[in-house]
Amino acid sequence: MKTVPRIALLVSLGLGVSHGLAADDMSPQVVEIVAKRFEFTPKEVHLQKGKPVTLRLRSEDVTHGFFARKLKIDAEILPGKTTDVTITPSEAGTTTVICNHFCGGGHGNMKMKIVVE
């Protein structure tokens, strides 16, 4: 009789573990992006269509913008702070991200690419 409760306990623990793994699979991927001196690093990121992702934005100098019309992103990146933007890309393609907050003489060249596959 003791075997049946032990089996039931092991089965319920196993179901809990597999359920926990499924929940972790749905957690957004995190991509770190740094804005500094007229550039974003990295210059290009690749995302998967239909998979949630958090873009973790940080500035190492002044206030910057992070604007991507196709992905409906318009964020401000303040120095010393982290700005998280979570999206789920719905269309494949390449989007250019620009800094839309004037940050100095090289501001017009501050761009990066997001590629959704």
Predicted regions and their residues:
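N-terminal edge beta-strand
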Residues: D25-P52
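Bacterial N-terminal signal peptides
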Residues: I7-G16
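A mature extracytoplasmic/lumenal domain signature
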Residues: R37, K51, R58-D61, K70-K72, ...
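N-terminal post-signal-peptidase region of extra-cytosolic proteins
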Residues: A35-K43, A68-K72, G80-D84, V97-I98
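N-terminal, post-signal-peptide region of Sec/Tat-exported proteins
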Residues: V45-K81
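Positively charged n-region of N-terminal signal peptides that target proteins for export
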Residues: M1-R6
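Extracellular/periplasmic metallocenter environments
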Residues: H19, L78-E117
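Boundary at the C-terminal end of the N-terminal hydrophobic targeting segment
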Residues: G20-D24
